[in-house]
Amino acid sequence: MGGLEQWNWYLDGWIIVAGILCAVSSALLGNFLVLRKMSMLGDAITHAILPGLAAAFMISDSRSSLPMFLGAVIAGILTALFTEWIRGFGKVDEGAAMGVVFTSLFALGLVMIVQAADHVDLDPGCVLYGAIELTPLDTILIAGWEIPRVVAVLSVVLIINLLFVIFFLKELKLSSFDPALATTTGFNATIIHYTLMTLVAITAVASFETVGNILVVAMFVVPPAAAYMLTDRLGIMIALSAVLATIAAVTGHISAITVPHWFGYQSTSTAGMMAVTAGLLFVVAALFGPRHGIVVVFIRRQILAWSILSGDIIALMYRIEERNPQLKPDVSYLREILFSRSISTSLTLRYLTRHAQLSDSNGNYQLTELGRDRARQLVRSHRLWEHYLVEHAGMSAENIHKKAEKLEHFTDRRLREKLNEDTIATDQDPHGRPIPPEEQTN
């Protein structure tokens, strides 16, 4: 028996709840780390709190939660403070400052752990990897309900982070994009910054022992980064990051139970699979995001390239018709002039023929009335731009064709009217060729 057959709603339910609380708490703040280009601060803090944990163990000689929490939070806040101090004092970028601080503090923490190992029951593996699977075993009683301790802690952290984002969204937005302007509007961007850093430290520490370093760092960065690929609006980005974090937590735990059985293994780390799932969600967003997705951008560029090529063919046919109305060029003739690939030219000609802009007579093409109307406006745009570039930009007539050839594809009727108004004489272009009239509309 394996996989979902082993599912226990009490045990697995609390594990998922803990994962969701950690993921959403981290993602809410992670949006502003991503916007400030400080994505790895969460990683720096989760490494740099080791000396705080070790110091708390050495002082209290126990693993009780309160000393651990306080020591780690203090170390996390000091990490943010030291990073800012080194960045300002040393005139280095944020990434270099974080690298100096977290490696130094992490090394110090390891030394302290070694020194404390004989006196304190300290498990570095727990610190690094967490044990979210053990969440249901450590419970407390609240209002007659027995719930896992970490769920109670992370619920408080989530509420605090959510309230902070809701009530200070304007300040966070402004200080993230323009700290100087934020200060001039009446609130201190530095206070907002250090409050954010403090909450990042608290969130990291609250999640650290249960879910470990991997999941905390992943949820600070990956869901916000994925949401950033899906939208340009901050409010939507924050909501999407929370949704993606939730999906990663749920599907990550289910995958940790089911996927290993496909390969003959019993199970794997839930925290690790949650991080992997978040990474897969980012890959999907990076590939198929509606504005910035790699595949979508590629398709959009191909459509634009095809649109430009079809316009170039139509405009070229118009110019050929101007010079020699009897000439009906074939694919090879057009491709040679346009320097385009044979397959691209052939497919575009087929499309233009199918949409009644060109007529095909045994492989020789000529404009239809519909195609001639479109070509006339493209050529008009081209020659108006040539006139404008000579008259207003001071360019010579020999150097304007390539510029106008690009601009003609992004010129609508309104812009043509503006160009027409701004030029002194618009009957002919600088080369003496007639400028076609504007299409009359009813």
Cite the ranges covered by each PLM segment:
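Membrane-interfacial amphipathic/re-entrant helices at transmembrane-helix boundaries
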Residues: 1-24
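Hydrophobic alpha-helical segments embedded in the membrane of multi-pass proteins
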Residues: 24, 47-48, 103-104, 191-202, ...
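Short loop segments and helix-boundary regions at transmembrane helix junctions
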Residues: 31-122, 227-242, 246, 254-268
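Helix-loop-helix "hairpin" substructures at the membrane interface of multi-pass membrane proteins
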Residues: 146-218
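Structured cytosolic domains appended to multi-pass membrane proteins
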Residues: 323-442
